[in-house]
Amino acid sequence: MLELAKETDFEAVNRLARQVTAHHAQWTPELEVVEHPYPMDFFLACIKPDSIRENAIYVMRQEGRVVGYMRIYLWNTNSTVSAKRTILSIDDIGVDEALRNQGIGTQMMAQLTALAKEEWGCSSICLYVDAPNESARAYYEKCGFRVRNIGMTLRL
């Protein structure tokens, strides 16, 4: 079940975040794999009941064990040319590399979609994915995501 992380999930979430960071470092070499990608003070801020507006960490459990996580937040459009709406942004998502391709990510995404729609009143979910990460892009498309924007980076 997908739920807001607890303080006792600190090490498990950081272990998964290290896996994700190591994977992404192949496309973003300046990423540094550190012991705690989410330091304790940041982690604690992300697990407060009202943290969804800033940064919230949700975990997926199987038999009591953390097998996946997401760092997410809500934001509202603030435009004079479009309708006001609430959007859920996924900043990080990871499933234990030993358990990938077993449907855990699909379950996480389905449960997150239900929360976004029913609990938080979101009109959409957005995320960014590294362009060379073809397996992630295919997974997100399978979940119903469509390319909307193309981000670009100029390395200095």
Please identify what each model-predicted range represents:
Residues 99, 103-111:
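Conserved acetyl-CoA pyrophosphate-binding loop and the N-cap/start of the following alpha-helix
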Residues 42-59:
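A short helix-loop-beta-strand connector motif used in the catalytic cores of GNAT acetyltransferases and
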Residues 106, 131-149:
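Conserved active-site alpha-helix within GNAT-family acetyltransferase domains
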Residues 83-97, 153:
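Conserved acetyl-CoA binding element of GNAT-fold acetyltransferases
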Residues 1-16, 24-26:
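A short beta-loop-alpha structural element at the N-terminal edge
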Residues 59, 65-74, 89, 94:
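Conserved beta-strand in the GNAT
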Residues 22-45:
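Conserved GNAT-fold acetyl-CoA-binding loop/helix
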Residues 111-112, 122-136, 153-156:
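Conserved beta-strand-loop-alpha-helix junction that forms the acyl-donor binding cleft
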